[in-house]
From Swiss-Prot:
GO terms for biological process: proton motive force-driven plasma membrane ATP synthesis. Produces ATP from ADP in the presence of a proton gradient across the membrane. PANTHER family: V-TYPE ATP SYNTHASE SUBUNIT D. The keyword Cytoplasm does not apply. It comes from the Bacteria. GO terms for molecular function: ATP binding; proton-transporting ATP synthase activity, rotational mechanism; proton-transporting ATPase activity, rotational mechanism. This is V-type ATP synthase subunit D. Transmembrane segments: none annotated. Keywords: ATP synthesis, Hydrogen ion transport, Ion transport, Transport. It comes from Fusobacterium nucleatum subsp. nucleatum (strain ATCC 25586 / DSM 15643 / BCRC 10681 / CIP 101130 / JCM 8532 / KCTC 2640 / LMG 13131 / VPI 4355). Belongs to the V-ATPase D subunit family. Gene3D superfamilies: 1.10.287.3240. The keyword Acetylation does not apply. The gene is atpD. InterPro entries: V_ATPase_D.
Length: 211
């Protein structure tokens, strides 16, 4: 702990006591914020873990279907079949506020062309390729949700660390320093008051002797 360099006056004492009250209130608010951030962060981590398992399984299934399609189709026809996407996809993003953290909300904006989701005819393609396209179509939304949650986790973790540093600074530096300085000024003021009383008593005794 380090005492603050201030003049030991009653005005300084009053000002420091106000700062101490403010620091304690700020510490409580930040600690409450930190606890709530941690609660929401843990929920996001659980959601992220569950969704990641789902996405990895869906992607693995899609890849297996694609391998089967590759085995049953000529490379030329396969490349030609998937070279021209059937729909244009953009990502629309807005922000939502969670405990002063702006986290992303994302969704796909699809510009679909007429007809089916398959970007090819069915004469020279296989059922395995159809299965691959269907599975990839289904996994897209989960992939975007996973990206949204993982970015939110990163932003929340940054805010938790920032809040933790502020809580620790108040708890282990600012508040103890203020408390120590307030205590020191009180002691000095008490000493000054006792010294003043002693001088006054001596003056009174001298006046009484002269009377």
């Amino acid at each position: 702990m380090a005492k603050l360099k201030v003049n030991p006056t009653r005005m300084a004492l009053s000002e420091l006591k106000k700062r101490l009250v403010t620091a304690r209130r700020g510490h409580k608010l930040l600690k409450d914020k930190q606890d709530e951030l941690m609660r929401q962060f843990i929920n996001l981590i659980k959601e992220n873990k569950k969704l990641r398992v789902e996405v990895e399984k869906e992607l693995s299934d899609s890849f297996k279907s694609f391998l089967l399609a590759s085995a049953t189709m000529s490379p030329l026809f396969l490349e030609s079949a998937i070279s021209f996407p059937k729909e244009k996809i953009a990502v629309e993003m807005k922000l939502k506020n969670i405990m002063s953290v702006n986290v992303p909300e994302m969704k796909f904006v699809k510009e679909e062309m007429e007809g089916s989701i398959f970007p090819y005819g069915f004469v020279q393609t296989s059922a395995e390729l159809d299965d691959t396209v269907i599975k990839l179509q289904k996994v897209l939304d989960n992939l975007l949700s996973l990206a949204e949650i993982e970015k939110s986790c990163q932003l929340m973790a940054d805010e938790i660390e920032k809040t933790r540093r502020r809580v620790n600074a108040l708890e282990y530096s600012t508040i103890p320093n203020l408390e120590e300085t307030v205590k020191d000024i009180r002691m000095k003021l008490d000493e000054n008051e006792r010294a003043t009383i002693t001088r006054l008593m001596k003056v009174k005794q001298m006046l009484q002797k002269d009377a």
